Amino acid sequence: MNNLLIFLLLALIISPNYGGRNQNEFEEPDQSQHSHDSLHLRQRDHIHRTLRYDRPNPATHNQILEQLVDVYQRTIQPLEDAYHYNDLPERNDLSVGQIKANPLVLFLGPWSTGKTTMLNYILDTDILRTGAEPTTSEFTIVSYDEKKKSTEGVVLVSDKSKGLDALEKYGQNFLERFTGVGLPHPLLRRVTFLDTPGIIENRKQQERGYPFNKVVKWFIDRAQLILIVFDPTKLDVGLELETLFKQLKGKESQIRLILNKADSIATQELMRVYGALFWSLAPLINVTEPPRVYTGSFWPYEYKFNSNSALFKQEEASLLQDLNDVIENRLENKIALVRQHATRVRIHALLVDEYLGKLNKQWTFLDNQENVIDKLLQSPSEFNIFKGVQTKNNISPFDLPSPSVYRDFFSNNHMTDFKPLSQHCGYFSSCLMDQLDEAISTKLPALLAQANKQKHFSESRDEL
């Protein structure tokens, strides 16, 4: 609730002449700028300045990215394939396309809260359709292209280089509600945005004709920044929004709450709405530090109530800085993502190997093999399968999946189809597990150090 206390204090001291710490960062339009004044548009130079549209990637950026892909293909993917990691019912898959893809910024929230308008504002475009009624019925991915173009979902998932091919599993009805928009905007060379259908509390998921929540979860798992946008005039926290926040568990550090259209209500009402928002969301966000809330009006026009304009400008500057941090840290985040994925693949391979070891130990020619397998799957604790993997490999119990995951996994992959880890060793090459361990402990940390060095060099050059 620290954010609320700070906001209340600011609201009490703000006046039309208020000048905050970042006051000079936003200058009022000069009287000579007739084009802005006549249309009542706000200046947007601060967006360009904060996000550094035209700043090219450092020369070493692509080199580090290619090295990361090489580590994945040589040391992680072989174990993925050997133990059918992608057949796990609960997993975060990874592909070369996803590694090379720009960081993803995801817009979520109830209908008509200004998600699409906010995206249009950041990109200085009106190509994405907006309106008072629900207008976004599609998942729209906005990325760079040499010219303005629209791409159907079927085409998007067929191009593996985009890292979206896994979405094909959600069916034709979803693909008809999935579209891509390409724009020749320099910011899109460095980041990709996803606009989503607004949540309507009285609409059942089944009416959409595709697994909406599963699709949202797929994008949540791959997003580096998640903006959840609210309208202060209609806070509606119901079952649909509750489901969304359940899907966001574990991603709290990437969530930003946006109280949009804040200039449409007076200061006292805004204070009440701010408190009501936290009160409504408190049961859904079980973390010590609540997500940051940004209050403002994220569209190109002048604020309606000028008394809070300085606060809104500072809030917008902070949000833009958050977005810029995601862009600037994209290499470090990619390396961390691949290392996390490698750890999951390692745990999976160790568990399959442990199941195989117990099967070979328990099964004799006098036993029915299927009965032994069933016993292992139904009562893994009796054979210390998960406990054995945990203690022998120094793995946290919180990193181990549920035994039910492996009941599902082995129902589609017969246990005897796999070889023990000891048999995945070459005569002239090291074992697959040894290669993976080296990637986790040595190669990926070395790449991270290289990326940090590149980042510090770029920042030092910018200061000159």
Question: Could you describe each region identified by the protein language model?
Answer:
Residues 1-2, 303:
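Context-dependent free N-terminus signature
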